[in-house]
């Protein structure tokens, strides 16, 4: 089972999905344009975290609504939910019957997830360049401008106009890879879908 800080790192990576879901091959300008225009996206994901000692794979679904609303639900091999309601990030571990809540600004304020609430973050926080193609997927490399960002780079891959994959390499050499499916770049989402109330009987912790 992943620790909370790893979950937030994954959230940080995936927040970029809003910016790239309709980018075309070699079109960093199109990526920027979509970042300015996109308001929401939903779909499914498979996440793999590779470290020197082990590899972990998880599956789930996600939805994002700008500004600043997101929900990530892990369904296999464990059940966890991450909800950002604009003020608070809620991490609900179903198996542990435990909820951890954190200030949204503190949890993701310095990470790529800031793009969720600030459309200028893409260009202000990253240096973007085309990064070639592999297995029919075209990549854009996003390098953080801050030296203490905690990760080396993010690679954003798209195929046939659709978001296909993302990769993040952290400062310790661990790599998180995500593949996407069932994307909807114009989902009918309401703000109410991102409200979270801790279930009765669970422990609630504050960071």
UniProtKB/Swiss-Prot annotation:
GO BP terms in the entry: lipoprotein localization to outer membrane; lipoprotein transport
NCBIfam families from the UniProt entry: lolA (TIGR00547)
What keywords is this UniProt entry annotated with? Chaperone, Periplasm, Protein transport, Signal, Transport
| Phosphoprotein among keywords | no
Q: Where in the cell is it found?
A: Periplasm
Q: Name one Pfam family in it.
A: LolA
Protein family: Belongs to the LolA family.
According to its UniProt entry, the function of this protein is described as:
Participates in the translocation of lipoproteins from the inner membrane to the outer membrane. Only forms a complex with a lipoprotein if the residue after the N-terminal Cys is not an aspartate (The Asp acts as a targeting signal to indicate that the lipoprotein should stay in the inner membrane).
The family database entries (PANTHER family) matched by this protein are listed as:
OUTER-MEMBRANE LIPOPROTEIN CARRIER PROTEIN
Cellular component per GO, a single term? periplasmic space
Report the source organism: Neisseria meningitidis serogroup B (strain ATCC BAA-335 / MC58)
The reply on keyword Ribonucleoprotein is no
This protein's major location comes to periplasm
Extract the signal peptide range.
1-23
Q: How does it assemble?
A: Monomer.
According to UniProt, the name of this protein is: Outer-membrane lipoprotein carrier protein
């Amino acid at each position: 089972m992943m620790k909370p800080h790893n979950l937030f790192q994954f959230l940080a990576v995936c927040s970029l999905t809003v910016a790239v879901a309709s980018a075309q091959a070699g079109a960093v300008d199109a990526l920027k344009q979509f970042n300015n225009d996109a308001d929401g996206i939903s779909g499914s994901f498979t996440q793999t975290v590779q470290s020197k000692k082990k590899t972990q794979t998880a599956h789930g679904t996600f939805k994002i609504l700008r500004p600043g609303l997101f929900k990530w639900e892990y369904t296999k091999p464990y059940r966890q939910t991450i909800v950002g309601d604009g003020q608070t990030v809620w991490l609900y571990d179903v198996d542990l019957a435990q909820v951890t809540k954190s200030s949204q600004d503190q949890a993701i304020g310095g990470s790529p997830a800031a793009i969720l609430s600030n459309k200028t973050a893409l260009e202000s926080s990253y240096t973007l360049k085309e990064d070639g193609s592999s297995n029919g997927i075209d990549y854009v490399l996003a390098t953080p401008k801050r030296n203490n960002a905690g990760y080396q780079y993010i690679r954003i891959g798209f195929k046939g106009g659709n978001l296909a994959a993302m990769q993040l390499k952290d400062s310790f050499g661990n790599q998180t890879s995500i593949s996407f499916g069932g994307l909807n770049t114009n989902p009918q989402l309401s703000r109410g879908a991102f409200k979270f109330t801790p279930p009765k009987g669970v422990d609630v912790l504050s960071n």
